Amino acid sequence: MKSHIAIAISLALATTGATAQTSLSTEVVVDRTIVPDAANAMRPAGLYPRTILPEAQRRLPAIAAFDGYGDINRLYSPLSPTREPALPETSTRRGYLDLGYFPTYNLGLSAGYRILNNERTRLSVSGQFDGYLYHADDEDESLLRYNGGRVNADLDQAIGRGHLLVHADGRYSAYRSAAYDSQSTAGGTLSARWHATAGAVHYRVGVRGFVDHYGEFTPAGTTALGYGDITDRSGGLDAAATVRIDERSRAGVEVKGDWLATTDATTLGVVGITPYYAYTARHFTGHVGAEIDLGTGGPGNKVHVAPEIAGTWTPSGLFALYLRARGGQRLNALRSLREYTPLMPAIYGLGRSNVPVDATIGFNVGPLSDFSLGAFVAWAKATDWQMPYAAPVAPLQAADVTALRAGLTASYAWRSLLQVSARAEFAQSSASKAWYEWLDRASSVVGARLEVNPLAGLHIHADYDWRGGRKILCPGGFTRPLGCRSDLSAGASYAVIADRLDVFARVENILSRRYDLLAGIESQGFHGLLGLQVLF
């Protein structure tokens, strides 16, 4: 059953007294020795990688499980994203409905249903709506408002020894802010992928495309008549194959092609090929390859070569040493860059960026007496990377950034009743130094989480997230602070009727600490969601 971030702090404290998205993240696991999967060229640049702590009751995860994605600026409390109805495989239910509300206006509605659900066919539809409204803590009490929704359809069809995956969605959103007035967006996506096995060869072929339209808007505080409509059109294809050489090794190749056409801008493209060799032994798994990208259209160097290397050494079940180096070109779709905040306007095409190298080395120790520990060091360089910029008509600007980043993680679990985890990450931060996926140029990121399960069906948690040294680049090459994020949140959920009805609530930014998302756009104060989930 899908877990929720839940009950208001007062309710949580009352419960604990009687008995004794946190930011959402998405984990994408790619095992190149089984199902090769190239990095998505349209990957949201507004997300930053975050180390996932090993679960204390399990062996150390494979290298692909060490990274997840979490949001930089949690402006509101969205429900879990709907792409597939969030039902456990063992559930006899075929649909769900989530509804959450928090005054004065934070609203979340999520629903999904599996129309067909058998061994060969799974056809699902789902939808989601998120909305919020709040006033900035300034002299004018500026109003910030957002409403957005999407509907999805997903098909997973087994055909022979292969699978056909088809996805379609439509989306709409609109926002208003004091800094950027208002803008609306409408768009849709269609993709299909086929993967199958033929003898010793496993292969995959896919196509995808989307269209997004952004309406006219006028920057606040300017005399401009307004910027005209802008449309993003994108298409792509990818293919991959891997062949087994012997019991321990495989060889493979991945091919991708993406293009992006934006109104009044040159059509851009990236064509890439990634050959690699993968090897698995008793205590070691790894692969060695290179991503060779050719850019089409637009200025700049068109040919780039980046490493595609990963390895994990596990001499025992309590220790793992891992290494990863990657990179490549990517197209900057407006939809992905607005993941930083939906209040960011779309004005012009954002071009193409390149990551020559993003390398990480680290280790994990544990679980030892239910305690796990990890550490890593990383270095990365990015060119023409779109970073927030303090100008009303240019909210993003291409920049070349490099940075060294290091972090520590720790976790402890006592049976199934108590789990505690913490992390601390630090990176170089200045006008020219920044971790490229931290668009707020933070210099420190600290987080902690406490989970308690005192009764069957009752889950309580508390979280703290800190992002320090946040800043934005200004005209003239200097930076201005955006304010530190200090976010304390708490919640709980309770299964009123097992596998049928849950109630949940969550509160975020309990201390109501404000900070800037962009120049002139302030975060929301105390907020959350109170609601329920119904399975049917």
Language-model segment annotations:
Residues 23, 494-504, 524-536:
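Outer-membrane beta-barrel "beta-signal"
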Residues 77-81, 88-138, 143-151, 161-162:
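Outer-membrane beta-barrel translocator/receptor signature
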Residues 91-93, 105-107, 145-149, 182-188, ...:
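Residues that define the transmembrane beta-barrel architecture of outer-membrane proteins
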Residues 101-103, 129-133, 159, 170-176, ...:
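Transmembrane beta-strands of outer-membrane beta-barrel pores
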Residues 111-115, 151-157, 188-196, 237-243, ...:
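Residues on the lipid-exposed face of transmembrane beta-strands in outer-membrane beta-barrel proteins
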Residues 119-124, 161-166, 197-205, 245-253, ...:
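Repeated loop/turn-to-beta-strand initiation elements of outer-membrane beta-barrel proteins
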Residues 132-152, 167-202, 208-234:
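Flexible loop and strand-edge segments within Gram-negative outer membrane beta-barrel domains
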Residues 335-352, 381-402, 427-449, 461-495, ...:
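Outer-membrane beta-barrel domain signature, especially the mid-to-C-terminal portions
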